[in-house]
UniProtKB/Swiss-Prot annotation:
Swiss-Prot/TrEMBL keywords: ATP-binding, Cytoplasm, Hydrolase, Nucleotide-binding, Protease, Serine protease, Stress response
Record flagged with keyword Cytoplasm: yes
GO cellular component, one term: cytoplasm
Biological function: ATP-dependent serine protease that mediates the selective degradation of mutant and abnormal proteins as well as certain short-lived regulatory proteins. Required for cellular homeostasis and for survival from DNA damage and developmental changes induced by stress. Degrades polypeptides processively to yield small peptide fragments that are 5 to 10 amino acids long. Binds to DNA in a double-stranded, site-specific manner.
Record-given protein name: Lon protease
EC number(s) per entry: 3.4.21.53
Catalytic reaction(s) noted: Hydrolysis of proteins in presence of ATP
Location(s) in or outside the cell: Cytoplasm
Region (Disordered), start-end ranges: 807-839
Complexes and interactors: Homohexamer. Organized in a ring with a central cavity.
One Gene Ontology biological process: cellular response to heat
Organism: Leptospira interrogans serogroup Icterohaemorrhagiae serovar copenhageni (strain Fiocruz L1-130)
Record's signal peptide: none
Gene this chain is encoded by: lon
One example GO MF annotation: serine-type endopeptidase activity
Length: 839
């Protein structure tokens, strides 16, 4: 809707209190009230107002039809949109509507002339607001001369404010000069000040002239002080700008003079220009040269006092500190490299062979790109230290950073330069620190990468570890291609389960298994003991360790896959000796087994009760964990119930399925449903607080259930691992070496394992298998024959015994005429394994 034309109304702008018509006779006793936000309108001012559509616009229409007088009141709380009688002040200003125009949105634009103050006495109507009002008389409050002096002071201070405040227009200055009455002068000055809403209202409510002028003088003085401070700030800023401009022109003149004389004084600029020349001589990527040229040009014009100057300088400093030169051709000595690797680490032949292979290829072909190795193994087996030794053997610098728990992609690829305090990522930082393009970078704990809201660091590593992409690696901060293809990346992990398949595809995996006792003894004698003595300052005292004491220390105080715990207990022992040395007390020169309890207390580990399947319903399994191998005792017990199986011990989904398969197979094997009717099998795997999962406990669960059903305990000394199917097949498993090491550590020397893992067994070094007996099986019938006596086997259904005749090796098959002792069986099995290996 379009607004109509302005409707001229009776003009009462000239009404004065001393006019012929008494003012009180013209002003109505009741007024429509229009609420106003932010600041009130003072008497004696002509001003436009926009009244929104609705009840107030209708009130304006009613007023125009009547006497054209409105009451303007200030809202107390602007956030409270309810324009009620409780939300308006008691004092306001009566105004005469001079002109009105209707707006398209049904709102009304009015031009009003404010006349005098009024006070709300009572409300006649609250929707719309109509109030009965009174018009208080203005009281001098002071003698005439005092009022006159106060008015002059007000005029002088207002002129001072007008001179310093550019917001004062000429019209406002003229209006100020033409106002002669003190009350109107005070109202006018207050209306042009920038005050709080409550301060405005306090002036509106002042009927005593002296009080009103005093309030306005106080507000005016505050405003003058504020304007003065603003002027000082403005002058300071202007002076600073003028100074910067002057310095800029002087620097430009100085540069022009220096160029004429051939003198360069800016050390940073000289350094960056040399860097640019270096890039050009190296035939660097044109994109890099172009970017450095552009940044150097910006740097030459930047003001040192600005933030841009430091941003550009930091960027150029980082670029200048990177190794842009090609990787040097290093002299490779394989024998020296092998000695370096052997010096710090015992065994680890797979890792050492891979490094020597890489060096041999590098020697034959100089353009061999960087290699990415992934060392996987339990804690304490030397993954981090072997990486450091690799760098030493190759003659390269070494840089390590942990990615465990990293959640931000920018940690790898850097932050973009738009952010305050941005820096390059870890990869570029490593190259800056090492100053080598072919350094060795260790990504520690890569299996513990996390995903956060800032991105996926594992995905960022895909580009870093891809030989086809990292030739033009782009860090977010540099935003330039940089060749990292010559970097030798080594990653470490405890397990592969949490690493993405795509990331694993880019790395060559080398498994580091846990150490057996013999290996730990060698490590202790060759490396660990000397290190701990030196660390605690007792090397000069020539303390030695008896070999039997070393074995006892390993078995009784630090039973683990690695040697980190062994180092800790050894460190504790040597500290005890250090106290005796300082106190000048006697101490053993050779540590014997009997001395361990004196220095270290009661042994933490004894012969494990857990590894002894000593009652019916128990069997010992072998498990693999992220911290190495472990033994796993499985217990079975009949309890009252409606059949089925109850599982405890924090077993995962896979082990739960394995237990159901084992129960179904044994039920079918025994062919005696009455054994399981109205009884439930409770299967428990200690310890209950440790989560467990995996498929390799199938034959162990079946053996525990079979032992329970036959009420016969399994033969002692056996540990087993293998996945079981419903038809009795025994399937391959993983982590065989770790399981063998765990069994050997606790005194288990007879291992039942899947025949499909025979190849893996042959790859395990002989010193690990020394003193062990291995029994490969392909079906569960072979497992049962090993674990139970022939009399017990005869209790099983005929079909089971028939299967034994066709499956079991003749050296171990049942025969009533020719009995073979258990010792002979084990000897024959061991001989068979050796013959297969020779073949």
């Amino acid at each position: 809707m379009e607004g109509g034309p302005l409707e001229p109304l009776e003009d009462l702008s000239g009404i004065e209190e001393n006019s012929i018509i008494p003012l009180d006779s013209i002003l109505p006793p009741e007024l429509f009230l229009i609420p106003i936000k932010s600041r009130p309108v003072f008497p004696g001012i002509i001003t436009p107002l926009i009244v929104p559509s609705g009840k107030f616009a209708k009130a304006v229409e009613e007023t125009v039809k009547g006497n054209s007088f409105l009451g303007l009141v200030l809202l107390k709380d602007e956030e409270n949109e309810k324009e009620t009688s409780e939300n308006i002040y008691q004092y306001g200003v009566v105004a005469k509507i001079l002109k009105k125009v209707n707006l398209p949105d049904n709102a009304v634009n009015i031009l009003v002339n404010t006349i005098r103050r009024f006070k709300i006495e009572s409300f006649v109507n609250k929707d719309p607001l109509v109030a009965r009002v009174s018009y208080p008389e203005e009281e001098p409050g002071a003698p005439k001369n005092t009022t006159k002096a106060m008015m002059r002071t007000l005029l002088v201070m207002t002129r001072e404010l007008a001179q310093n405040n550019p917001l004062f227009t000429e019209e406002m200055k003229l209006t100020m000069l033409n106002v002669n009455e003190p009350g109107k002068m005070a109202d006018f000055v207050c209306s042009i000040l920038n005050l709080e809403k409550e301060e405005y209202q306090s002036v509106i409510e002042s009927n005593i002239l002296k009080t009103r002028i005093e309030k306005v003088l106080l507000f005016l003085k505050k405003e003058i002080e504020l304007v003065s401070i603003q002027r000082e700030i403005s002058d300071q800023i202007q002076d600073k700008i003028d100074k910067q401009q002057r310095q800029f022109f002087l620097r430009e003149q100085l540069k022009a003079i220096q160029n004429e004389l051939g003198i360069k004084d800016d050390k940073f600029e000289k350094k960056y220009e040399k860097f640019l020349e270096r890039l050009k001589n190296l035939n660097a990527d044109p994109e890099v040269i172009e970017e450095v040229t552009r940044e150097l040009d910006k740097f030459s014009y930047a003001d040192p006092n600005t933030g841009d100057y430091n941003v550009i300088r930091n960027y150029l400093d980082i670029l200048e500190s990177l190794p842009w030169e090609p990787a040097p051709v290093r002299e490779i000595d394989l024998e020296k490299a092998k000695k370096t690797l052997d010096k710090d680490h015992y065994k680890l032949e797979d890792v050492k062979d891979r490094i020597l292979e890489f060096l041999a290829v590098k020697k034959l072909k100089n353009d061999e790109k960087g290699t990415i190795l992934l060392l996987v193994g339990p804690p304490g087996v030397g993954k981090t230290s072997i990486a450091r030794s690799i760098a030493e053997a190759m003659g390269r610098k070494f840089f390590r950073f942990s990615v465990g728990g990293m959640r931000d992609e920018a940690e790898i690829k850097g932050h973009r330069r738009t952010y305050i305090g941005s820096m390059p990522g870890k990869i570029i930082s490593a190259l800056r620190i090492t100053k080598e393009r072919d350094c060795v970078i260790l990504l520690d704990e890569i299996d513990k990468l996390s995903i956060g809201i800032q991105g996926d660091p594992a995905s960022a590593l895909l580009e870093v570890l891809d030989p086809e992409q990292n030739k033009n690696f782009r860090d977010h901060y540099l935003d330039l291609p940089f060749d990292i293809s010559n970097v030798f990346f080594i990653a470490t992990a405890n397990t592969l389960d949490s690493i993405s398949r795509i990331l694993l595809d880019r790395m060559e995996i080398i498994n580091l298994s846990g150490y057996i006792t013999d290996e730990k003894v060698q490590i202790f004698q060759k490396y660990l003991w000397k290190k701990v003595l030196y660390k605690n300052g007792v090397t000069p005292y020539g303390i030695e360790f008896d070999k039997k004491a070393i074995v006892a220390l390993i078995d009784s105080y630090s039973r683990e896959s690695g040697v980190r715990g062994l180092e800790k207990v050894t460190d504790k022992l040597v500290r005890k000796i250090a106290i005796k040395i300082v106190r000048k007390e006697s101490f053993p020169k050779i540590i014997q087994e009997k001395d361990l309890e004196t220095f270290l207390g009661v042994p933490k580990f004894t012969d494990e009760r857990m590894v002894r399947a000593s009652v019916p319903g128990t069997a010992l399994g072998l498990a693999w964990t992220s911290v190495g191998g472990a033994t796993l005792l499985i217990e079975a017990l009949f309890v009252k119930g409606k059949g089925g199986i109850l599982l405890t011990g924090m077993l995962g989904k896979t082990m739960e399925e394995s237990s159901n398969i084992a129960l179904s197979y044994i039920k079918n094997l025994l062919y005696k449903e009455e054994l399981f009717n109205n009884r439930m099998i409770h299967l428990h795997v200690p310890d209950g607080a440790t989560p467990k999962d995996g498929p390799s406990a199938g034959i162990t669960m079946a053996s525990a259930i079979l032992s329970l059903a036959l009420n016969t305990k399994v033969k002692s000394g056996f540990g087993m691992t293998g996945e079981l199917t419903l038809t009795g097949e025994v399937l391959a498993i993983g982590g065989l070496r770790e399981k063998i090491v765990a069994a050997k550590r606790v005194g288990i020397h007879k291992i039942i394992y899947p025949k499909d893992n025979l190849q893996h067994l042959q790859e395990i070094p002989d010193y690990v298998k020394k003193g062990m007996y291995f029994f490969p099986v392909s079906r569960y019938e072979e497992v049962a024959l090993l674990l139970f006596d022939e009399k017990v086997i005869s209790k099983i259904n005929p079909s089971f015994r028939e299967n034994l005749k066709s499956i079991v090796n003749p050296t171990r098959k049942l025969s009533p005429k020719k009995k073979t002792t258990q010792k002979q069986k084990l000897s024959l099995s061991k001989q068979k394994g050796n013959n297969q290996k020779k073949k």
